[in-house]
Design a protein with these regions (language model features):
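Short beta-strand/loop motif that positions the catalytic acidic residue
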Residues: 22-24
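Glycine/threonine-rich phosphate-binding loop and adjacent beta-strand/alpha-helix elements that clamp
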Residues: 94, 103-307
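Conserved alpha/beta-hydrolase "acid-adjacent" motif
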Residues: 29-43
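Acidic beta-to-alpha connecting loop that harbors the catalytic carboxylate
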Residues: 26-28, 63
Length: 307
């Protein structure tokens, strides 16, 4: 659930009293994280407001389309969609936080709130960052050519015997803990047989199978943005995919698995149906880029939970 305190929605405004308070479910399927951390190519809306002179504060938890203290809804979440963070998810203090925010910005009462981002990792740990995604991420590129493709390289089309047409790619395990924090990129070469086609990618822990995040793209929008670039049947293009915001700790010894289908979650299948499969190229030039951070625990936030 997203909550705003804002007097001007244009991030280009640089003068006057402007502020934004964001309460966001990192597993929200309605107001999804990309509406907060996405934007046009090269833009992260959350950071764009900060850079434009807004006072911005965020509480970013692993709940779905719920309020931070909506316990009954939190109890119904599934694995890979917030369950692993459930024991430390509920924020009983969020309404008090909101009250103090508006007391200061609407009435001038009380101290100025800290302009930070409180982010919950997928295993439940809360911490305080200056912004999110953090500014100090280090990008780690993984060539899909170094990963294992389990046979198929077509997304969509007529179902194969025994199930739907999907592509499964498993990448090597990491030799140390890996903390993903931000918008994972997948720049993948692909070819269409039709003026259309769609790829939905679910990222999983290769050992446990737990969902980490997802991305989806219509190949006609392969360059990103809101307007279709279009595609010529048989043409190879680079699908510049970006995952919904992820804050996840992948333990040493585990790797990443990518499962590619035509649709997933609540996204609609392509209108062209089985007539528009997409050939994905699991090769060296297709790159998965992970934004990684290293934290020592000094910015961990302890939150009260029910007994």
């Amino acid at each position: 659930q997203a909550e705003d305190g804002i007097r001007d929605r244009s991030p280009s405004r640089g003068l006057g009293d402007v502020y934004k308070r964001q309460v966001q479910g990192m597993q929200d399927w309605n107001v999804d994280p990309h509406q907060v951390f996405g934007g046009p190519v090269g833009v992260n809306w959350y950071q764009e407001y900060i850079d434009s002179g807004y006072d911005v504060r965020g509480i970013l938890g692993q709940w779905g389309h719920h309020y931070p203290d909506q316990v009954s809804s939190h109890d119904g979440i599934g694995s890979g969609n917030g369950l692993e963070a459930r024991q430390n998810m509920t924020r009983w203090d969020w309404a008090q936080d909101l009250f103090e925010w508006f007391e200061y910005y609407l009435k001038g009462v009380g101290p100025k709130p800290d302009l930070t981002a409180q982010i919950q990792r997928s295993d439940g740990e809360w911490r305080i960052e200056e912004t999110w995604p953090p500014r100090d991420v280090v990008w780690n590129d993984i060539s899909l050519g170094n990963c294992t493709n389990q046979g198929n390289s077509w997304v969509g089309g007529a179902p194969v015997v025994g199930g739907v047409s999907e592509v499964i790619v498993e990448c090597p395990a990491f030799d140390q803990d890996v903390h993903i924090a931000g918008l994972v990129r997948l720049h993948m070469l692909a070819s269409a047989v039709y003026d259309g086609g769609q790829v939905f990618v679910e990222m999983q822990d290769s050992v446990t199978g737990v969902r980490i995040g997802h991305a989806t793209m219509d190949i006609r929008y392969h360059s990103g943005g809101n307007e279709p670039t279009g595609v010529i049947p048989g043409q190879t293009v680079t699908m510049m995919m970006e995952f919904q915001g992820i804050d996840h700790l992948l333990p040493a010894g585990n790797g990443i698995k990518l499962v590619m289908t035509t649709s997933g979650k609540d996204y609609l299948a392509p209108a062209c149906g089985a007539a528009c499969p997409v050939h994905v190229h699991i090769i060296e030039d297709s790159i998965l880029s992970l934004p990684l951070i290293d934290r020592d625990g000094s910015n961990v936030l302890i939150t009260p939970q029910r007994e």
